């Protein structure tokens, strides 16, 4: 992609904040990782906190600090309190890029979500996307983050449904491909994200689902569908392994080759890959 860039004077890469010319900076997009903390089983915001803290040291309230990283609703309050920064100066622009097609997805978004309490900052942020042919949703910070989390909840739920349909088709002796094709032709359902797999994985769906379960369980709220998506995925992976073992034993096989170690096609990402 970078070979197509005509004017590299508009693009530069740096490994530390000091090398940047902050005098000309109007908007900062923070895209740091927010991994799952295995000790607390909750999102780790230390990278986000460090990034905001570095920018806050400039003491320039005109800079629009925009968080693209995925963090739970209300968590930005804790982050800003830890570093003594006004959370109302933060805007949000959650990303919905897919691994393997990130550049295409950036230029062809289904929607653009902007969250913030300062209308001047969100309006300026909106102007950056004036040439994009996509619906722009401007909302509050909490809603913008929940949009991202619920998107990353629905998609694995849909994948889990297909995988359960796979087991049901196998049990009943039905033709799985015909079943999914027949169901997917319903316009209310569609055929996108509707293929069976050993199970789903990756660096986003698992951790985001864990966090969704964390923040709704803090209150008196029961969400039986959402709370069982991970369980369904784990059970399908176990079922897949059992099917492979049966295939091995029934045919006296000594070796089984697995093609594709990444968690999805068109990527080399091995994080939380069900194959491994």
How does the language model describe each region?
Residues 1-276:
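Structural/interface elements that position substrates and couple domains in central-metabolism enzymes
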């Amino acid at each position: 992609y970078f070979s197509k860039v005509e004017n590299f004077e508009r693009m530069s890469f740096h490994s530390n904040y000091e090398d940047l010319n902050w005098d000309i900076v109007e908007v900062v997009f923070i895209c740091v990782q927010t991994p799952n903390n295995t000790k607390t089983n909750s999102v780790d915001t230390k990278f986000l906190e460090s990034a905001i803290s570095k920018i806050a040291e400039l003491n320039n309230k005109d800079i629009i600090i925009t968080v693209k990283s995925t963090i739970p609703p209300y968590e930005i309050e804790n982050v800003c309190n830890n570093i003594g920064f006004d959370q109302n100066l933060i805007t949000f622009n959650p990303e919905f890029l897919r691994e393997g097609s990130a550049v295409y997805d950036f230029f062809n978004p289904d929607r653009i979500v902007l969250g913030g309490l300062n209308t001047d900052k969100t309006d300026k942020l909106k102007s950056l996307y004036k040439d994009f042919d996509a619906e722009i949703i401007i909302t509050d910070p909490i809603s913008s983050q929940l949009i991202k989390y619920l998107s990353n909840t629905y998609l694995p739920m849909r994948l889990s449904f297909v995988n359960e349909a796979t087991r049901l088709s196998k049990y009943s002796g039905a033709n799985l491909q015909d079943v999914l094709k027949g169901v997917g032709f319903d316009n209310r359902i569609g055929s996108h994200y509707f293929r069976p797999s050993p199970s789903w994985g990756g660096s986003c769906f698992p951790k985001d689902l864990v966090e969704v379960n964390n923040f709704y369980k803090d209150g008196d709220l029961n969400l039986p569908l959402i709370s069982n998506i991970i369980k369904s995925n784990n059970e399908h992976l176990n079922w897949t392994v059992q099917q492979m073992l049966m295939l091995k034993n029934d045919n006296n096989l000594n070796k089984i080759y697995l093609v594709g170690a990444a968690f999805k096609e068109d990527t080399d990402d091995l994080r939380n890959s069900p194959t491994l």
